[in-house]
């Protein structure tokens, strides 16, 4: 009997998949790994056995892809990111192998529910927010489009944290996602590299009078990659995500242990372990800052070393490197790559500075993800110089030469130097270095890019206009429709064919069905089924009964003040007041659903979570309102529960302060699943509005120009708004009058103060919550009224889906390829393999 991998490879795509062979493979895996049969295996053991069977198939295609890359030697992008928020792999891999339904049926025949098996898989704790999810979507699209790529990141043992809610407060606990072993990774010790920290630099001159630099008395760790397969959709292409683990160079010291110095015996092991324990260690103290910088340098150095080793297998002249390699730096975290590539080229490859700089500046490109200056990373020079002494010297020289350029272009203009220098005021400004060295600098939505060019990075744009470009973010429809919402995916395929899976623009054909009562009813039934699924999840995890016939109004995203979860919950408080004052008011039942993690050291964000849960406790337990209003906070928001949430949402909350959100991608996932957006004209909302129009979104609030104008003029006074709006004033006062904190009236004082009183150098209501509140409440009232018109609402939902085509990450990646990376597709033929 042929192994499952061969059966699938040769037969599955022509619909002769053998369920019998697949089950035999699973059975053999259980026997060999656990000494068990299918009947007595645990759910976790079944997950592992099924995953190993699927991995067998992937391995053949992975090897074949690598052979093609070795043979054809195409240009490769190394996508460097601190985060990769991948989501569960089993279901997604089966979707991309075109095998999900067949495997589901095979498992059903032996009494195994594929959904229960999928629920055994942990979400790999390799990311946290939109930055990491974007990177994951990009990897999926690169493989599906057939472009050779490596993702480069860190194999965090515990992720950022697993969120638990206790008495309404966020509690951070380790996310031990590796405890049962992860089947979709492959340790590659043959590609380990040394990464050095600390010590000092010794200069010497050789007989030819050339300077040499050597790092001495350093500590080092070994970077060991674990490769994860990234499966392209139905094309045999499997790219690699290489996530780096840190291992000690010398390991356990038996000599120190025997001498009783137990701490010293494990010193090297602890140094290595600490590097990869958590994502974004708290940097409110020096040790946290040091650890973050070491993490960034660690994975960047290892990734560049592996990239150069791979390049040198095929080429001897490093001047060819820009023709074969591009390093895309996803945000500022990996931007130390500029100096590290220079260090390797100058110190280890012995290239002259000018040659090394020419190569580097044609190999590195930078994606900016933020408009907020405080999020553009800066390191104290003292820390940077102490931890990375030779790299700092490289940065110093890059800066010296660039400041000369500034002075030549703008003689005597110290303000330009202050804004643009890489080293200034005791800090290393990483974004500045990325812009100086990168041949491309891109924003992630049209509005974001324009603000960068005209505001935050205007001086750089004036000096290097040719570098700046826009690449509006996107999402992969394969995970967020095909896998997350199979009912809607099957319905769309019946209506317009399956081509949308690789060409999302084909969903535009659904416009023809937007006015059809039959299509509207079919869509409504699918939406309700998904709402029932989410209601069941909420009951199981929160113990709250929610009405699937209520409006599901959802805000799920990283908790940050500019995203204005506080405004959302203040509006819920406002609605509750209205219902209490007038129980017979015209109000369509509404369930407000939140999901968000707050950074461990972010006080106001954590207090906002507590407020949401306190409001939920009051409202959900008030029988007098007859269930008209419910509030739910979904614990530990992540990709796997996000898929359930997106499919069920009626209303998508995209309410950031205009000009603050670079793009957003949650907005696109909701749109793809037929939710209507309430939002500001910010980030990608602007482009969504251009696609679907004012009739199919609920836009409110100030424009980005208005916000920026107020910020520049310093003329906004939230107290005026507070004094002139009695209903809003009542809501704000409820933060401190005990309505939602009867045992501690001061519990939410910091949130109250943030709205009305200047705080530690920050203006009051920095994110214009009170300024936009009334406009927001009016837009919410429009939702209440519009939802009652079932036909109109369903038409708008269908038109949102029909206009989502632009927002596929396939489109985004093709633009990166055309304008920045200049890659060629590879073709992987499995015939005869």
Predicted features and spans:
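A conserved ligand/cofactor-binding region detector
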Residues: 7-833
């Amino acid at each position: 009997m042929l192994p499952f991998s061969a059966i699938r490879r040769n037969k599955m795509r022509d619909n002769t998949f053998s369920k019998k062979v697949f089950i035999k493979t699973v059975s053999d895996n259980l026997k060999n790994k656990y000494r068990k049969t299918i009947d007595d295996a645990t759910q976790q053991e079944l997950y592992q056995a099924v995953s190993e069977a699927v991995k067998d198939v992937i391995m053949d295609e992975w090897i074949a892809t690598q052979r093609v890359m070795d043979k054809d030697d195409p240009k490769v992008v190394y996508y460097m990111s601190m985060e990769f928020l991948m989501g569960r792999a089993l279901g997604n891999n089966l979707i991309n192998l075109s095998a999900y339904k067949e495997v589901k049926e095979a498992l059903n025949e032996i009494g195994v529910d594929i959904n229960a098996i999928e629920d055994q898989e942990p979400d790999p704790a390799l990311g946290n927010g939109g930055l990491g999810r974007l990177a994951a979507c990009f990897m999926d699209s690169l493989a599906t489009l057939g472009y050779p790529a490596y993702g480069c990141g860190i194999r965090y043992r515990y992720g950022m944290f697993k969120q638990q809610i206790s008495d309404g407060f966020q509690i951070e606990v380790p996310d031990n996602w590796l405890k049962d072993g992860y089947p979709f990774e492959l340790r590659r010790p043959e590609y380990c590299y040394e990464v050095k920290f600390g010590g000092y630099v010794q200069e010497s001159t050789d007989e030819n009078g050339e300077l040499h630099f050597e790092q001495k008395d350093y500590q080092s760790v070994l970077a060991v990659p674990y490769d994860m397969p990234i499966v392209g959709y139905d094309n045999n292409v499997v790219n690699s995500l290489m996530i780096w683990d840190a291992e000690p160079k010398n390991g356990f010291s038996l000599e120190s242990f025997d001498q009783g110095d137990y701490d010293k015996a494990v010193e090297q092991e602890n140094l290595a372990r600490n590097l990869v324990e958590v994502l974004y260690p708290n940097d409110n103290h020096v040790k946290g800052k040091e650890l973050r910088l070491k993490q960034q340098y660690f994975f960047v150095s290892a990734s560049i070393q592996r990239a150069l080793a791979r390049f040198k297998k095929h080429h001897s002249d490093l001047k060819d490197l820009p023709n074969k390699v591009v390093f895309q730096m996803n945000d500022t975290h990996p931007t130390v790559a500029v100096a590290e590539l220079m260090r390797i080229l100058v110190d280890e490859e012995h290239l002259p500075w000018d040659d090394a700089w020419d190569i580097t500046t044609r190999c590195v490109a930078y994606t900016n993800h933020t408009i907020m200056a405080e999020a553009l990373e800066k390191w104290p020079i003292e820390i940077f110089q102490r931890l990375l002494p030779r790299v700092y010297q490289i940065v110093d020289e890059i800066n010296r030469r660039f400041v000369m350029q500034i002075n030549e272009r703008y003689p005597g203009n110290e303000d330009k130097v202050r804004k643009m220098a890489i080293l200034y005021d005791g800090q290393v400004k990483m974004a500045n270095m990325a812009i100086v060295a990168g041949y491309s600098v891109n924003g992630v939505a049209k509005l974001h890019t324009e603000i960068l060019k005209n505001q935050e990075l205007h001086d750089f744009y004036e000096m290097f206009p040719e570098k700046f470009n826009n690449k509006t973010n996107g999402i992969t429809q394969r995970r967020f429709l095909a896998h997350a919402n199979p009912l809607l995916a099957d319905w769309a395929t019946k209506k317009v064919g399956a081509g949308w899976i690789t060409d999302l623009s084909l969903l535009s054909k659904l416009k023809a069905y937007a006015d059809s009562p039959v299509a509207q009813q079919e869509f409504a039934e699918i939406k309700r089924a998904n709402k029932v699924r989410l209601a069941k999840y909420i009951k199981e995890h929160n113990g709250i009964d929610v009405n699937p016939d209520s409006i599901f109004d959802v805000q799920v995203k990283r908790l940050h003040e500019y995203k204005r979860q506080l405004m959302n919950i203040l509006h819920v408080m406002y609605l509750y007041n209205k219902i209490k004052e007038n129980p017979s008011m015209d109000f369509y039942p509404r369930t407000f659903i939140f999901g968000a993690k707050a950074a461990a050291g972010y006080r106001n964000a954590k207090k906002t979570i507590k407020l949401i849960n306190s409001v939920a406790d009051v409202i959900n337990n008030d029988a007098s309102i007859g269930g008209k209003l419910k509030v739910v906070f979904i614990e530990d928001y992540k990709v796997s529960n996000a898929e359930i949430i997106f499919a069920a949402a009626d209303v998508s909350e995209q309410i950031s302060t205009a000009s603050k959100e670079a793009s957003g991608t949650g907005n696109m996932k909701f749109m793809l699943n037929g939710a209507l957006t309430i939002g500001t004209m910010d980030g990608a909302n602007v482009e969504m509005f251009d696609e679907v129009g004012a009739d199919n979104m609920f836009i409110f609030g100030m424009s980005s120009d208005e916000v920026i104008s107020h910020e520049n003029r310093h003329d906004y006074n939230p107290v005026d708004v507070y004094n002139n709006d009695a209903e809003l004033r009542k809501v704000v006062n409820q933060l401190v009058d005990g309505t939602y904190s009867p045992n501690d009236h001061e519990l939410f004082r910091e949130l109250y103060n943030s709205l009305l009183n200047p705080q530690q150098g920050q203006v009051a209501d920095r994110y214009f919550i009170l300024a936009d509140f009334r406009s927001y409440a009016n837009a919410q009232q429009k939702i209440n009224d519009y939802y009652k018109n079932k036909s109109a609402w369903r038409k708008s939902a269908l038109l949102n889906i029909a206009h989502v085509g632009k927002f596929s990450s396939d489109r985004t990646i093709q633009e990166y390829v055309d304008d920045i990376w200049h890659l060629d597709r590879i073709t992987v033929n499995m015939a005869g393999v």
